[in-house]
């Protein structure tokens, strides 16, 4: 089975409140077998504007597991913190 990857592009709008998301989300990711590959490190954008200075990449064992995590009851309240304190997008892609 192919791995699933979450690619998040974010601009934090309220850093103080966003810290709660940063504290809570790793446990939920781990519960679904996810692991961080990149979490807000240095990056360069080509062929577009850099509107989202925070890039996060998470690998899950399968594409289905990534979707299960994103739609889970455990992630729902944590996701609400992120949505209230940042702008951006999450993309879930199936690996090769």
Label the predicted regions.
Residues 1-96:
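Conserved, structured core segments of small domains
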């Amino acid at each position: 089975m192919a791995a699933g990857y979450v690619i998040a592009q974010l601009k934090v709008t309220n850093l103080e409140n966003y810290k709660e998301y940063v504290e809570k989300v790793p446990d939920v990711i781990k519960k679904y077998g996810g692991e961080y590959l990149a979490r807000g490190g240095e990056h360069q954008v080509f062929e577009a504007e850099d509107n989202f200075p925070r890039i996060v990449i998470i690998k899950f064992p399968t594409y289905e597991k990534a979707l299960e995590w994103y739609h889970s009851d455990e992630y729902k309240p944590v996701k609400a913190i992120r949505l209230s304190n940042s702008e951006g997008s999450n993309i879930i892609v199936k690996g090769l």
